[in-house]
């Protein structure tokens, strides 16, 4: 839950383990950089953010990239020591919608 008193970039989370569901292009790396530049580039602050995710948390990436880019994508993440549990390729281009319960 966003905590307005602590600033717009602060989120209060429970002490339970977390599942981070992150879009890849335009959120973590330059949008379509893998196509236009031929390689991925982190957006400012993204690499540091990813390294701050606690070890026991689950990390899922969603992307509209086709599976033909899977090896290059996973190589980039591995070279930068980005830990993840799953990458879902070929997601629709529209919004990502997450529905979750509120923790007490």
What are these regions (language model features)?
Residues 1-104:
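HAD-like aspartate-dependent phosphatase fold
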